[in-house]
Amino acid sequence: MTQHDLSVALLAPDFYHYAPSPIAAVTANDDALVVSWPDGRQLSCHRFWLRENTLGHGGIDPATREGIMDPAELSDAMQIAAFDLTDVGDLRVTWVPEGADESAVSTYHSGWLRHIAEGQHLPESWVPAPEVWNASTLSQPPRHQADAVLTDDDVLCDMLNDLLRLGVCLVERAPTEPGFLTALAARIGPVRDSNFGLLWDVKADVNLAGDAKTNTTANTGFRLGPHTDLPTREIPPGFQFLHCLINEADGGESTLTDGAALIEELKATRPDDYEILSTRRWVFFNRGPGIDHRFSAPIIDPLGGEGVPTIRAFYPVRAFPDMPDADVGEAYAALRRFHALADDPRFELTFQLGPGDIMCFDNRRVMHGRKAFSGSGQRHLQGVYIDRDEILSTARAVNRARAARQTP
């Protein structure tokens, strides 16, 4: 290991490896240092940001790689006394002594600074951008083998990238033993709990349908139109995995519709409907003994305002208009057209889940449903929810790890 290899671990305030990207020049600009590379790319580094990201000296804890400086401690006394470049092109800053302390010298890894200059530190980095689809552009979800997802990081990476890009994928040839889904979920991240439990069943069972903790129309044989789960929550689950254990029933085909495609269609052809659906609020309410989850929001909910809005569209729990009386009529009209569009063959995929298939989808973007099925023959699925943060975190980690493996 070279001296520079040793410096990589010491200078980067996180746990990633950064290839050296020697800095060409550094200049002062008011309260910032401007770092420049030979290709002309620049990064402005405010002195407080540099001080917070100093390894040691009260900035970044070398063990946890997390900041330990309380912002209240930032002061005008934190001034840069000198700056230059090391022999290998890293940024070196000497700080004015603070009180009785000796002057601190901070070194910042050139590759770490470069990755910030390129925007690789942003939330959307290291994950694919969403691709909108409809029934003519996506004939079926991409498929991945269960055993490979569990054992091969490259396959896991491909599976998560498909899931984030399209909002849906299928994992096939999984064991049909109850509980296997928890092993697949553990490969990705923690499962999100709900009143249904960490792992829940979907089957036509009058006891499940009426139980205090499992009461839902999903546990009947009724048709379920395109919908998303748990709109009754402030933040609905990000992703849902449904594992088919048995499917001997007549009917019960699964459906998928990309909510992002519906939003594009509405904006292009019915902008008034889009405005109504994204601003008029409804109360979503879980009915059940001992259960009272409720939340008020529009059908197309911008939530954080970035990316694809959250679709809140589960009519069994959409209970009350929460809008001026004068708006209710047009809200119902827009709602009727929206659900008809979601069920339109131009947008909806229809297919049959077989034993061992696991349907994975973005619960806030992709609307799922099923056709009605008869009481003859068994149909048993198990499901889990995983929050978006966990999917994104693991996707970034495996994408960065694959990139590192492919870097000479």
Placement of each model-derived feature along the sequence:
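Active-site environment of non-heme Fe oxygenases that use a 2-His-1-carboxylate facial triad
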Residues: 2-13, 126-158, 162-168, 173-174, ...
